[in-house]
Every structure is written in structure tokens, then in C-alpha cells.
Amino acid sequence: MPSFTDKLTVGGSEMDMYAALPSGSGPHPAVVIAFHVGGLDDFDRAMADRLAEAGYVAVVPDLFHRYSKEVMDGPRLDRIGHLRDADIIADMNAAVDFLTANSAIDNDRIGVTGFCMGGRIAWLMAATNPIFKCTVPFYGGNIMGNWGPGDTPFSMAANINCPMLFHFGSLDGNPSPEDKDKMDAELTRLGKSHEFHSYAGAGHAFMDFTNPDRHHEASASQAWPRTIDFFNKHLKGAVVPA
């Protein structure tokens, strides 16, 4: 599949964005990927490539583009402490604007997914941008917390108006089992269409094949086909086999 890295300008700052393209002239459905704490790396690019192979334009914006080299060279988890939800929303929306300005994209068929911290961001974007027709968060924690001023993703759940598919590892502590129950209960109370899938023996980041300590192939091999089926149903109108 063809791919490239483009540069977008967001709030006066230059942001890299990886894009993977399916074959054919389109117009194609598209998916915006919110990356994990590792940043825009081989894992995220591979996920975009897989989506392109399934017929989607996939883009991954570099949400760390405001960070100094010192921050990026430090502990990975420390990067999250510098993130602000307002900046994340601006960056993700810049990726959406890139898509909607392209005639090869069907603006009525755009979804969002994310891994790790990107799972949280996928929820956040579903609650703040109605263009998304479906959302697939992978093991997104910290849903009940805000990054910078403003409401938490959890408190904005009423604003979500698209179906959601969640993937969790049964051994993951973030989100905790209690947090998952709370998320499920709130989405149910609000009448939001959602599916929760928990994978036995999997911990956090079980999709990340670049991390042997985290990767759980048995779970990943179930979660990814479910994801493609979900996108096909909601972005292509395809009938998903029972």
C-alpha cells in the first residue's frame, strides 16, 4: 500500500502525520489513529498500513510535535504529563481537516481508533467531533481524568453519538476492572451503542507486536478482525458474518 508522511500546521506548530492509502481511486472511508505513548513509531505505522490493506485511508498525527527533545528522550510515561486535551483535539481535528479536504475521501465515512493513551483520545474525539461515525478504543485508561483544563472524556459521554467497540486485556490495570464497569454502566445508562471485549491472559498494549513483553498474539488475532468487521459495518455498510 502507498504511504507518506505529510506536515500539517496546528496553532503555529508543524506536525508530522503518517498516511497510508488503499488501492483504487475512491472515494474511500477513512480512519484517524490516535497513537500510543511510544509516539509515531513502527507499531502505529503498521496499524495504519493494515487499515489501508482493508480499504481505508488511515492517518496518524504526531501528537507529541510540541515536545522538546529533552521530553522525548526522557521516560515515555512522562510524556503524558505534558499533554493537554485542548491541544490533542486541535491536532486530531487537523488530521480530520486534511481528510475532508481530499476528494478521495468520503467525508460521511470517517472513524477513529487509538491504542493505550490513544484509546482515551478515541473516546475524547467521539465526544467532541460529530464527524466520526464509529470509534474503536484499545485499552484506553484515564477516561475519568482530564489532561489540562476542561471536562473529562467520561463526563462528556452524553455527547457521543456513534457506536463504540472496546478492547481490553483481562490483566490490565489501566483501565482497572472497576473503571471498565463504570464506563460500561455510564454508556448503558446513556443509551450509547457499545461493545466491550475482554481478552483472557492479555495485559496492557497486547496489540503491540514490537513489544514482546506486552504482545499477546492470541488476543490480537481476535481483536483486529473484530475491528475490521466493525469498521466495515459502520463505514462501508458491509454485512458482518454472524
Label each region the model flagged.
Residues 188-242:
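C-terminal catalytic histidine-bearing segment of alpha/beta-hydrolase fold enzymes
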Residues 56, 63, 140, 199-201:
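Active-site loop/turn elements of alpha/beta-hydrolase fold enzymes
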Residues 59-61, 137, 166, 196:
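Hydrophobic residues in well-ordered beta-strands that form the structural core
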Residues 67-71, 142-147, 174:
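A short beta-to-alpha transition loop/helix N-cap that caps and shapes the active-site region
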Residues 160, 166-168:
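Short beta-strand/loop motif that positions the catalytic acidic residue
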Residues 5-105, 152-153, 206-211:
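Serine-hydrolase catalytic machinery in alpha/beta-hydrolase-like enzymes
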Residues 173-182:
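Conserved alpha/beta-hydrolase "acid-adjacent" motif
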